[in-house]
Regions:
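Short, hinge-like loop/turn segments at secondary-structure boundaries
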Residues: 1-4, 89-91
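A conserved pocket-lining segment of Rossmann-fold NAD(P)-dependent short-chain dehydrogenase/reductase
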Residues: 2-23, 31-48
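Low-complexity, charge- and small-residue-enriched intrinsically disordered regions
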Residues: 9-13, 17-25, 87-111
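Mid/C-terminal beta-alpha module of Rossmann-like enzyme folds, strongest
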Residues: 35-96, 111-151
Length: 151
């Protein structure tokens, strides 16, 4: 969110095609609890959220929920690397080369192992619904951006 707040034009690394299966921390803790209580510790389990979303879709959803207008523009790889090298020089880098390398690969279930859904513990929390709960922090009027009937 820091970059989305600071930049009017937002770079899309790898064209924003990197896929994610975001999982909410409450879903993850429930999975851990169930795995321990049911003694399912002999398996590798990939914990995934209920939906697969591209980086570009995540950014579009964040912008819509936070009521911001930004231009999303694909950034050529050499410029992305150059910006990551520059950002790494800052005390609190907004992007590092390692983060850029990670964006090259999808972060979804590999298919090699069972997922939480396969063992009967599906994720419940949806991305948009959870982000909406905290989005007021990034809206122009902060907590006062909520509609009166929501309070």
């Amino acid at each position: 969110m820091t970059l989305l707040n600071r930049l009017f034009i937002f770079p899309l690394y790898y064209n924003g095609n990197t896929k994610f299966m975001p999982i909410h921390c409450s879903d993850l803790t429930e999975i851990i609890y169930q795995v321990i209580s049911k003694n399912i510790v002999s398996h590798t389990i990939e914990c995934v959220g209920p939906e697969t979303i591209s980086l570009k879709d995540i950014l579009k959803r964040l912008l819509k929920i936070t009521e911001k207008n930004r231009i999303l523009i694909p950034l050529p790889l050499f410029l992305a690397k150059l910006s990551a090298v520059f950002f790494q020089l800052l005390p609190n880098p907004l992007l590092t080369l390692d983060q850029l390398r990670l964006l090259k690969y999808n972060n979804v279930a590999s298919g090699k192992y069972k997922t939480n859904v396969d063992i009967g513990i599906p994720s419940i929390c949806k991305f948009d619904e959870e982000v909406e709960k905290y989005a007021f922090m990034w809206k122009e009027r902060g907590q006062f951006s909520r509609k009166r009937n929501e309070i």
